[in-house]
C-alpha cells in the first residue's frame, strides 16, 4: 500500500477544542482502518504543523477522501504528501536514463 505523510495544523476551532484532540485522533484511526488503511504513526509536533501522521492507504483517491473528510469537520487543515520508502526510491532512481 502507498505511504503518506499527513501534515496537520489546527484551525481556530480545533485549538479551542484541543482537549478533544485525542478523541478525534481515535476517530481518525477508525476512519483510516474502515477505508482499508493503517495509521502507522502519529506525532505532536512543534513548528509550522501541529501534528504529523504516517498513513498507509489503499490508493491516492481513498487517502484524499480521508483528508478532505477530516478537513470538512473544521478542526484541522491538512497537507498530504505521497511518500516513497527506500526500496521504491531506489527503483525510481534506477529507471532514470
Where are these regions (language model features)?
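Short S/T/G/P-rich N-terminal loop/turn motif that feeds into the first structured element of a domain
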Residues: 1-33, 38-40, 49, 86-97
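An amphipathic, aromatic/His-enriched active-site/gating alpha helix that lines ligand/cofactor pockets
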Residues: 57-84
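Short, well-ordered beta-strand segments in beta-rich or mixed alpha/beta enzyme
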Residues: 5-9, 43-66
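A short linear hydrophobic-aromatic micro-motif
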Residues: 36-43, 78-80
Amino acid at each position: 500500500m502507498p505511504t503518506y505523510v499527513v501534515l496537520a495544523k489546527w484551525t481556530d476551532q480545533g485549538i479551542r477544542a484541543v482537549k478533544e484532540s485525542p478523541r478525534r485522533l481515535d476517530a481518525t484511526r477508525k476512519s483510516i482502518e474502515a477505508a482499508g488503511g493503517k495509521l502507522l504513526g502519529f506525532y505532536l509536533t512543534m513548528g509550522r504543523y501541529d501534528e504529523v501522521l504516517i498513513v498507509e492507504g489503499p490508493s491516492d483517491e481513498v487517502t484524499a477522501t480521508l483528508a478532505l473528510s477530516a478537513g470538512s469537520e473544521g478542526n484541522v487543515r491538512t497537507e498530504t504528501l505521497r511518500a516513497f520508502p527506500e526500496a521504491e526510491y531506489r527503483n525510481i532512481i534506477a529507471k532514470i536514463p
